[in-house]
Amino acid sequence: MKALISNDDGVNATGILAAKNAIEDLCEVCVVAPETQQSGIGHAITLYDPLRINPTTLRDKSQAYGVTGTPTDAVTFGLFEIMGEKPDIMISGINTGFNIGKAELTTSGTIGAALEAASFGIPSIAISQEVTRDYIKFENGTVDIDFSFAGKMLRKLVKIVFKKGLPDGIDLLNVNIPENPVDEEFEVAKLGNRMYTPIIQRRLDPRGKPYYWIGGDPYNSDCEGTDGHCLKKLNKATITPLTIDLTGEMDLIKEWLK
């Protein structure tokens, strides 16, 4: 068995090392990730700049590859340049901070990497862990965080995938781990509305010209059964099954056009 591991926090992030350590005795592992922090880049691919693959080592001295591009670029290189053959599973993470809700789904580089692998028929898992101080993710993910529980839960899922694959019609799993989980079970949850309510901060530079920061406050209005509610209200680890087919109900549009 072979696994490709990537992320959007960067190849030196604590979470990607934790993911590797969690499963490396189950399969052959190849780590290919962006060289720098790529949070919020979504499923973007680099088309207008040359890219480099730089061999590197993780903090445990194991081999990895840093790509001067996006998470999708890293997965593309992993699949078609570095590994040489299709892996049995692709793991994106362990991400620093949640990836929940419909609105943020396509902006997440963590999920973007998993989507890219899933588009080639590879069972994929995007896994993220809550951190109280969400801003630390912008420190290139290198802050020491205890990902041991998330690693344990990831290992459990990888074993199931190796045994059964993913169910028909499911292309990838979006997995989120609370900082203080109540148990070692998963709650299967649907996507909530969003992760943040956007906030735009307007400031002035020394010459009086405006510039802006986009931020947000946590969204806390998700109803029961959603990923946000299960994670934030119940402290339960969640799995949300996803499909790359975004096609809506075609018959409704045919009727609508009449």
Swiss-Prot record:
HAMAP family in the record: SurE (MF_00060)
Listed Gene3D superfamilies: Survival protein SurE-like phosphatase/nucleotidase
Residues that coordinate or bind a divalent metal cation: 8-9, 39, 95
Bilayer-spanning residue ranges: none
Family indicated by similarity: Belongs to the SurE nucleotidase family.
Organism expressing this protein natively: Methanobrevibacter smithii (strain ATCC 35061 / DSM 861 / OCM 144 / PS)
NCBIfam families listed in its UniProt record: PRK00346.2-1 (NF001491), surE (TIGR00087)
Function summary: Nucleotidase that shows phosphatase activity on nucleoside 5'-monophosphates.
Protein name (Swiss-Prot/TrEMBL): 5'-nucleotidase SurE
Protein keywords: Cytoplasm, Hydrolase, Metal-binding, Nucleotide-binding
Gene behind this protein: surE
Cofactor(s) essential for the protein: a divalent metal cation
Catalytic activity: a ribonucleoside 5'-phosphate + H2O = a ribonucleoside + phosphate
Top-rank lineage group of the source organism: Archaea
Enzyme kind, highest EC tier: hydrolase
GO cellular component, as recorded: cytoplasm
EC number of the protein: 3.1.3.5
Cross-referenced InterPro entries: SurE, SurE-like_Pase/nucleotidase, SurE-like_sf
Chief place of localization: cytoplasm
